[in-house]
Amino acid sequence: MSCRKFNAPRHGSLQFCPRKRSKTIRPAAGAFPADDRSQPVHLTGFMAYKAGMTHVVRTKTQVAKNKQLSREIMDAVTVLEAPPMVVYGIVGYEKTVTGLRRLPIVTAAYVSDGVLRRMFGNRYASKESAGQFCKGSVCESRVEMIKERAHCVRVLVQTQPTLIKGLGLKKAHIAEIQVNGGSISEKVEWALGRLEKEIAIGEVFGVNENIDTIGVTKGKGFQGTVKRFGVRKQPRKSRKGIRKVACIGAWHPSRVMYSIARAGQMGFHRRTEKNKRVYMIGNGSSNIKTEFDLTEKPISPMGGFPHYGEVRNDFIMVKGAVVGARKRVVTLRKSLLRQRAGEELVIKFVDTSSKIGHGRFQTSAEKKAFYGARKADIAAEIH
């Protein structure tokens, strides 16, 4: 024990206390970007489903004193499938001395079954009464109230999980997303014109833009202190356990402090990650190619993403990892920080090899050209 240090930094961050399970699997955005009324009316968020990860090769340009250098960098990226969202309601908030207060909601004439399932479950009576949210003069009076008294306007949107076969979801995920830009009346008219209509992810975000991701991490269950906080294991000769904290506090105060590493829930926490760079926005049904890699191929790897499948709808590619398991809903939001002029984004290569093993080929045609014709293919041609 001669080399033992008697002082060390604490293990585990106290930033995310308490470490408990999230209330919902789709956490709402707690804040939205500041409203700039000089800009055109636009939406500030979107919902997508995590598909999986791959990697890309891009060119980075560095400017030195007398020369300009460029080198290739490989980045890990996350692909999220984002089918178009549907607007089914409008809500306004007025400013009071105690904060924002919600005004009456204006809903569309038709609300899909996915929204009713999410709001009322399978209770038939509730769904019948919910089909008459507001109609006629009631809606008109509520719209006028929002125009006169609202400080900010948000729209009620729903996802379309039935477009993704691998999810097996009937309940749509619903959320409130703020509308920024323009005056209050312009925002209300913009929202009224998009009731019961789809909004694509390309209308909200752009390539080379920084966004925030809000989601729930993978759940790990009840774990000990070594895995949960990363504390050091005790020596082999220790009594009454090795994977535990040796001293949990002083004699007085005669209680265990909250800052002591203890066993408990790990994972399934709500987390917000800021300034994720958007690398690509496209559609899974169309092929992609770059200026350097002219091979046309789908965004899905060979065999599909493990435990997810193939991406067939709109998708967004984000640099780095995104919290949560595959098939989990993630809320994307425009960055709260001021956008800075970033470097030019030049993607040279997108990897689409199989993620099930050590993939060698980018497309099935490339694999067939390498191995040649199979017996099954020859037999199929004969018959």
From Swiss-Prot:
The keyword Ribonucleoprotein applies. Signal peptide: none annotated. It comes from the Eukaryota. Keywords: Cytoplasm, Ribonucleoprotein, Ribosomal protein. Disulfide bonds: none annotated. GO terms for biological process: translation. InterPro entries: L3_arc_euk, Ribosomal_L3_dom_3_arc_sf, Ribosomal_uL3, Ribosomal_uL3_CS, Transl_B-barrel_sf. It holds the Pfam family Ribosomal_L3. It is found in: Cytoplasm. One of its GO terms (cellular component) is cytosolic large ribosomal subunit. GO terms for molecular function: RNA binding; structural constituent of ribosome. Belongs to the universal ribosomal protein uL3 family. PANTHER family: 60S RIBOSOMAL PROTEIN L3-RELATED (PTHR11363), LARGE RIBOSOMAL SUBUNIT PROTEIN UL3 (PTHR11363:SF5). This is Large ribosomal subunit protein uL3. The gene is RPL3-1.
